[in-house]
UniProtKB/Swiss-Prot annotation:
This is Ribose-5-phosphate isomerase A. The gene is rpiA. It comes from the Bacteria. Catalyzes the reversible conversion of ribose-5-phosphate to ribulose 5-phosphate. Pathway: Carbohydrate degradation; pentose phosphate pathway; D-ribose 5-phosphate from D-ribulose 5-phosphate (non-oxidative stage): step 1/1.
Length: 223
């Protein structure tokens, strides 16, 4: 089963290569599907200027392939950002951050002109919320943020033993009834001590490449 899942992830990741423009800096996300994208990108490393990366793990993989990794502050434009999702709807709204890289992912997504999500069909959902919503918090605010999240109807669980690349902690929030993703995303971000959360609703995917048994489906959300 895992071999088949990997084949679907690889198919979705390789389909994203059609959107890569020569001579540009490519935004690169984090996760198992993105790892396949990085491997495919290596075959065109001489065509691109380099990449900006959303995690130390992706940076390490990019560099191992000889792809130059730039600091985001030194880059003027990121034409495309390729990343996976833990859940995605037909509207391109997502839950992301199961791997803990949500803040840097959200920053690069905000900068990028186009967001291409690569995923297998198991990630497509009618409504977000089955997968816990990760919330990155400043460590000293963990208990306070957790209490505020309970008031919003969520059940926060501290991801003990995990520290983000930014030196912060993660609360995985279960049992959210997500009827209005953009509203909940804003409410979570308004809690003092929250860095950001894994709802990508205000800035979702422009294109979703969903790998199924019979091929890769292209879902154009906007643009």
């Amino acid at each position: 089963m895992s071999g088949n899942a990997d084949a679907l992830k690889k198919a979705a990741a390789e389909a994203a290569m059609q959107y890569i423009e020569d001579g540009t800096v490519v935004g690169v996300g984090t996760g198992s599907t993105v790892n396949f994208f990085i491997d495919a990108l290596a075959e065109r490393k001489h065509d691109i200027e380099g990449a900006v990366s959303s995690s130390e793990a992706s940076t390490e993989r990019l560099k191992s392939h000889g792809i130059e990794v730039f600091e985001l502050n030194s880059v003027v434009e990121v034409p495309i950002y390729v990343d996976g999702a833990d859940e995605i709807t037909e509207h391109g709204q997502m839950v992301k951050g199961g791997g803990g890289a949500l803040t840097r992912e959200k920053i690069i997504a905000a900068v990028a002109r186009k967001f291409v999500c690569v995923a297998d069909e198991s990630k497509m959902v009618g409504r977000l919320g089955q997968f816990p919503v990760p919330v990155e918090v400043i460590p000293m605010a963990r208990s306070y943020v957790a209490r505020e999240i309970v008031k919003l109807g969520g059940d926060p669980v501290w991801r003990q033993g995990f520290t983000t690349d930014n030196g912060n902690w993660i609360l995985d929030v279960h049992n959210f009834d997500i009827m209005e993703p953009m509203k909940l995303e804003a409410e979570l971000n308004n809690i003092v001590g929250v860095v950001t959360n894994g709802l990508f609703a205000q800035r979702g995917a422009d294109i979703a490449l969903i790998a199924r048994e019979d091929g890769v489906q292209t879902l154009k959300v906007s643009g």
